[in-house]
Amino acid sequence: MEMDASGASRAPISVLPAAEVKSTLKPEADKPRCSSTPCSPIKSTVSGYQILHMNSNYLVGFTTGEELLKLAQKWSSPDSSNTEALPSPIKKPVDLGLHRASRIYKAKSRYYQPYDIPAVNGRRRRRMPSSGDSCLKSIVSGEPSKALHGPLPLCLLKGKRVYSKSLDYLNLDKMSLREPVDTEVLQYQLQHLNLRGERVFTRNKT
């Protein structure tokens, strides 16, 4: 008889008979390996739920036993054609989804090429033209009206200048000369304010 440090006996006490213990442990082993992947290929049933159909994206539709009975009653009718078509709703979505996915994949690999393709003149060009390409082409061909009014939004066209203020720092010729003067004036005023404040503070101290 093994004894624990606290004095309690450590002998295993079996309340259920061996057959019952085995029966209780069985569903644990039958469950899928991971709870987040109920569509694992081990079993199609997950603790009372049966997988009704599985998508090509592994989206699974579950149904309980009661729902399955209702569906069976709905499908069952005197016509033999309906009874023959019973298993088809379960198989169809899987097959259709897989075929559809493979077809799309084939079409994509054949026709859709978004990556760069080398051009004739040696430069690499894009397969799919961006929105700015038409603007650049019209500027090069000498049609500024098309270039401005085509791809640009209305908010930029309504203003006096088409270009944003951030571009002014790049265009040094067009930059206004008032800005440095303004900053100097502001700095001067700030210094005077600080000096006045310091003087008042020293006066109050003495």
UniProtKB/Swiss-Prot annotation:
Record keyword Protein transport present: yes
GO cellular component: ciliary transition zone; cytoplasm
Top-level division of the source organism's lineage: Eukaryota
InterPro entries: UNC119-bd
Knockout mutant characteristics: Morpholino knockdown increases the recruitment of macrophages in response to injury.
A single BP term in Gene Ontology: negative regulation of macrophage chemotaxis
Broad class of where this protein is predominantly found: cytoplasm
Annotated localization: Cytoplasm; Cell projection, Cilium
Keywords per UniProt: Cell projection, Cilium, Cilium biogenesis/degradation, Cytoplasm, Inflammatory response, Protein transport, Transport
Pfam families, sorted: UNC119_bdg
Coiled coil: none
Subunit structure of this chain's protein: Interacts with unc119 family proteins; interaction preferentially takes place when unc119 proteins are unliganded with myristoylated proteins.
Function noted in UniProt: May play a role in immune regulation through regulation of the macrophage function. Involved in the recruitment of macrophages in response to injury. May also play a role in trafficking of proteins via its interaction with unc119 family cargo adapters. May play a role in ciliary membrane localization. Regulates the macrophage function, by enhancing the resolution of inflammation and wound repair functions mediated by M2 macrophages. The regulation of macrophage function is, due at least in part, to the role of C5orf30 in regulating ability to inhibit glycolysis. Probably plays alaso a role in trafficking of proteins via its interaction with UNC119 and UNC119B cargo adapters: may help the release of UNC119 and UNC119B cargo or the recycling of UNC119 and UNC119B. May play a role in ciliary membrane localization via its interaction with UNC119B and protein transport into photoreceptor cells.
Family: Belongs to the UNC119-binding protein family.
Name the UniProt record assigns to this protein: Macrophage immunometabolism regulator
Species per Swiss-Prot/TrEMBL record: Danio rerio
Lineage start: Eukaryota, Metazoa, Chordata, Craniata, Vertebrata
